[in-house]
């Protein structure tokens, strides 16, 4: 199997919202984002798929080492890195942003709680903000401020993921909601770990939803006018996640403890087409 074929298979297996905007891209850009997303999926699998933390750490260290070969003109071992080697020069993808993504996965191995929102934002920057920046580079931009937009929009998407996955993460022993905010709303950790929503938990989650929604608006305002056309695929992803956030809100955000909300594939396609034609309006 060719390296690029491996990446396409990896992405197809994920059934991700990423796929909904791909059809609007050139083949070259579609392939590049496919490779990037396959890289992200592989790292996620290291953290979520290894039950032994020591094995996960060894595997993550191996990914760091193999990534070095991508940027040192050596032949990497993993097919994702082989595909990445082929595209990183074409789109000027910097090594430090891939390293930051691995650093974010390292945080998942080392800590299960975040004291403050500032701590959580660092995590979000590493696992989502830099992905947004890499996607922005692949899509193309003329104004450097577009990278600020991409980082902020990555934060919005990751906050949405965190809200959606509160129950699932709790069952894996993780709570991403900041401790300071849980204390402010008088929500002890056992409420989340035992997946038993309370009125205070509902208020905490409404606060999370409102902040995420405002983050989408702030991110959209950061996108320079001259790059709105080139960044449309990123906006499609944002629109789908924003719709997910609204569904969680309508359903009752406290219910994330008991089940996971998802946007059906046909609706994702409708959102993608609408956003392509009329833009994203959070």
List where the protein language model places each region.
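Catalytic cores of Mg2+-dependent Asp-rich isoprenoid enzymes
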Residues: 1-159, 163, 167-282
């Amino acid at each position: 199997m060719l390296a690029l074929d491996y990446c396409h298979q990896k992405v197809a297996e994920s059934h991700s919202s990423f796929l909904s905007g791909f059809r609007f891209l050139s083949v070259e850009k579609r392939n590049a984002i496919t490779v990037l997303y396959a890289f992200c999926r592989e790292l996620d699998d290291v953290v979520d798929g290894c039950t032994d933390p020591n094995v996960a750490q060894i595997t993550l260290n191996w990914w760091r080492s193999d990534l070095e070969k991508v940027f040192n003109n050596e032949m990497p071992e993993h097919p994702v890195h082989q595909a990445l080697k082929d595209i990183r020069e074409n789109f000027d993808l910097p090594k430090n942003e891939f390293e930051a993504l691995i650093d974010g996965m390292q945080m998942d191995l080392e800590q299960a709680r975040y004291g403050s929102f500032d701590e959580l934002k660092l995590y979000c920057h590493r696992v989502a903000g830099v992905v947004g920046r890499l996607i922005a580079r692949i899509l193309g931009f003329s104004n450097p401020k577009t990278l600020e937009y991409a980082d902020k929009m990555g934060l919005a998407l990751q906050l949405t993921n965190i809200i959606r996955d509160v129950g699932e993460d709790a069952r894996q022993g993780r709570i991403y909601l900041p401790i300071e905010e849980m204390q402010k709303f008088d929500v002890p950790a056992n409420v989340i770990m035992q997946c038993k929503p309370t009125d205070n938990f509902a208020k905490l989650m409404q606060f999370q939803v409102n902040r995420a929604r405002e983050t989408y608006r702030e991110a959209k305002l950061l996108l320079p006018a001259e790059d709105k056309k080139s960044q449309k695929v990123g906006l499609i992803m944002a629109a789908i996640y924003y719709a997910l956030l609204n569904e969680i809100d309508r359903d009752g955000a406290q219910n994330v403890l008991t089940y996971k909300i998802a946007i059906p594939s046909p609706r994702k396609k409708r959102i993608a087409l609408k956003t392509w034609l009329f833009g994203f309006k959070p």
